[in-house]
Amino acid sequence: MRISPGRQTILTLAVLTMLCISFADAFSLDMPTTQKYADTYNKQIENVPSVLKSLIGSEKVNIIVTREDGSNFQVGMDIVSARIERTVEGGISDPTIVITTTQSALGEVIKSTDRIAAFKSQTDAGQIRFEGKSWLANAKIKALLSSTSFLQFCYGLFFS
């Protein structure tokens, strides 16, 4: 079965969105906490149907969070076959997707009783940004983030 690159990118973005929301739970911007949440994600991904895991595919992702004091926390994730194979302090060279946000934006998500709505509000306001390294990836990111029902489905899949 051949899976189109478009489906792989959209599902990968859904996974990354859920990862950002899970990192918001921790709100501790350090490598041990990041690794803990990567490990938790990897355990959850084992419960996802194989067909969905095959659609998620592989990506190199950098997440950059500007802390309240103005410093940056940057972590790279090498996602292979839907699993986070490694986290890299400082980021990965040549990422396929870059997620940029602030500690205060994550705080808004944490405080909310409806984290999906808060996450969507922060992305709509540009406080949480996803950047694909191609125009096609950017178009797919925009389509994914505009679907609240899809975000809720993915959140339930990984965190229920």
Stretches with model-predicted labels:
Residues 24-160:
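Feature captures hydrophobic
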